[in-house]
Every structure is written in C-alpha cells, then in structure tokens.
C-alpha cells in the first residue's frame, strides 16, 4: 500500500492548475492512499475563504478533497510534538527551509507515517522528510 501525505501547497497547485499540476495529479492518482493533516485542511480552508470568502468555496474544496480520495488524519500528541520539533529545526527564521505552521504539520504526518510528502516548492527538500517528487520534476511540468 502506497501512502502519500499531501501538503497544502500541492492542493492549491492542483486547484489553481498551476504549472506542474499534471505531474502532481499523476502522483496523487498513483498512491493507494492519500492523507492530509486536519491542520492542513484548516489551513486550506483559511486560504480559500480568505481569497473568495464564501461557503461555496469551502464546499468546492471539500468536494475536491473527497473526489480525490484524500482522507483526513487527526493530530495526536506525538504528531504535535514532531510538528513542534520541525519548527525548531526547520522553521521560518531558523532554517533555510522556512517551514510555516501548516508545513510543520505536513512534515509531522509524513514522518509519523514514514510516507512521502507531495508538495510544491523548495522548502521540504531542505528537511529530512521523504519527498514524493523531485524539484526538477516539478519544474519540468
């Protein structure tokens, strides 16, 4: 069973059809199980509501996640501790990776499940998390 942890950045890129979205979609589809931290679901909701500000946008987001078979994973105390440690090691203002709050929860979920992380950008490659796509694959798309 191939579990894939999905970061907020990957969902945003898919929803906005950003460059490389096709490769992200292929990776997402290839996984037998896709998971998103509930902390990242809230982050996605805040981003969507901040840009569009209506309930229909949030309903669209939830339908997309359901259609993509992305399951929510609750944050427990051990995972929260890993997220806190991720900030101390890789957080904004502390490390070139510059992980933000949501990034720390994606990192923690990937580490907890020992699963690759699907994301967009150069932040997570500067950490010790397993990555689902190399940056050059993102750039080629």
Tell what function each PLM region has.
Residues 71-116:
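Active-site neighborhoods of divalent-metal-dependent phosphate/nucleic-acid chemistry enzymes
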Residues 11-12, 41, 124-125:
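A generic structural signal for short hydrophobic patches within well-formed alpha-helices
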Residues 1-36, 49-63:
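Short, well-structured N-terminal submotif of metal-dependent ribonuclease cores
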Residues 3, 107-141:
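Acidic, PIN/NYN-like endoribonuclease modules and their adjacent C-terminal/linker elements
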Residues 51-55, 90-92, 134-138:
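Short, hinge-like loop/turn segments at secondary-structure boundaries
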């Amino acid at each position: 069973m191939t579990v894939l942890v999905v970061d907020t950045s990957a969902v945003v890129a898919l929803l906005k059809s950003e460059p490389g979205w096709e490769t992200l979609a292929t990776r997402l589809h290839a996984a037998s199980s896709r998971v998103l931290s509930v902390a990242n679901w809230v982050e996605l909701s805040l981003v969507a509501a901040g840009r569009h500000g209506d309930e229909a946008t949030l309903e669209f987001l939830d339908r997309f996640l359901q259609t993509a078979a992305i399951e929510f994973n609750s944050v427990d105390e051990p995972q929260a501790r890993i997220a806190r440690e991720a900030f101390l090691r890789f957080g904004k203002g502390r490390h070139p990776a510059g992980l933000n709050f949501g990034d720390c929860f994606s990192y923690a979920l990937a580490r907890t499940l020992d699963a690759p992380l699907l994301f967009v950008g150069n932040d997570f490659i500067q950490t010790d998390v397993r990555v689902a796509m190399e940056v050059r694959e993102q750039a080629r798309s």
